[in-house]
């Protein structure tokens, strides 16, 4: 038998255990500062937000990991979102934070990308413990996955912590609508 510990909601929220509002738990400290990143793709090439493919585009930046069950649920949706909106100016960037074994042997990451048909930019950003150092502009970045929505001007316009799995029914369907709606709103804006 496995032991479980219950925590009252107010105590959990106070200690950061569970987000009380998934759209506000993780936020960008200074909205005037652009989202910056630097990480390696699966070929070992360094990619940053200044890469020409991102210029003037709306970005969905996903903090993910191949070890994270909800990241497995979110990846196919992000691939679908990318295919639907890339022609309108959307780029999706995964910043994957992996354990030492995955960093040493990229086959698991390659299998993750292949399994979900990921054709958006997939970068290896470091270990989970380095997330605060690699993404210093974020506050309360302590749950996987976390997704940032970045306007054409490079500034964070929204974030979402966690991902409601397909088994959650209406929660999942609503989250898909929310993500799509925010992407459409950002795409409609001219930078």
Predicted regions and their residues:
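Structural microenvironment flanking redox-active thiols in thiol-disulfide oxidoreductases
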Residues: 73-116, 127-134
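N-proximal helix/coil linker or "cap" segments that precede and/or mark the start of modular domains
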Residues: 2-40, 52-56
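Short pre-active-site segment immediately N-terminal to redox-active cysteine/selenocysteine motifs
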Residues: 57-59, 64-67, 74, 99, ...
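A short beta-strand-turn-helix
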Residues: 37-59, 82-85
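Hydrophobic beta-strand anchors of alpha/beta hydrolase catalytic cores
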Residues: 60-61, 92, 147
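Thiol-/selenol-based redox modules, centered on thioredoxin-like
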Residues: 20, 143-191
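Short, internal strand/loop/helix patches
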Residues: 110-146, 150-152
